[in-house]
Regions:
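Catalytic DNA-binding helix-loop module of base-excision-repair DNA glycosylases/AP lyases
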Residues: 36-42, 46-75
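C-terminal accessory module of base-excision DNA glycosylases/AP lyases that mediates lesion recognition
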Residues: 1-4, 12-36, 68-140
Length: 140
């Protein structure tokens, strides 16, 4: 996680507001919580998908997924999902909703393997999105 700058936020006066916004996001109030998190993160140069999606993914892995941009865009491209073209580094709800749609499709396509939650779905994205011909070790 974007630890160095995020520590300043989490140890500062707006820590509670950020955690509350992250909790609202995790509970499904994404339309209001996403802009609230962005407003709190922007002064720390941390208004990034990795930061915004991390806590909800940990707190509610049955509903939320972690957005690691490069590997996720690569995966979306490989499976020709609209997220390939919809992705934007700006924190827009339609981007996250597209990611959730991609996750839903993965869950459906892997139903016979009985994925437990989005942690399993994230693993599929990571392994496939990180795959490169001829490379034996995963990229860090």
């Amino acid at each position: 996680m974007e630890k160095t700058r995020l520590q300043a936020l989490l140890r500062g006066s707006e820590a509670d507001a950020f955690v509350r916004a992250a909790a609202r996001f995790a509970l499904g109030e994404m339309k209001t919580a996403l802009p609230a998190m962005e407003r709190l993160l922007r002064p720390h140069d941390d208004a990034k998908w990795t930061v915004v999606t991390y806590l909800s993914f940990l707190w509610r892995p049955e509903d939320h997924i972690f957005l690691k941009p490069e590997v996720t865009k690569d995966f979306a491209s490989r499976v020709q999902h609209p997220l390939e073209h919809q992705y934007d580094a700006e924190l827009r709800l339609d981007v996250y909703e597209s990611l959730l749609d991609l996750a839903k499709q993965i869950r459906h396509n892997f139903a016979d393997l009985q994925p437990c939650d989005m942690i399993d779905i994230q693993s599929v994205i990571w392994v496939v999105g990180d795959y490169r011909d001829g490379r034996e070790e995963p990229q860090e």
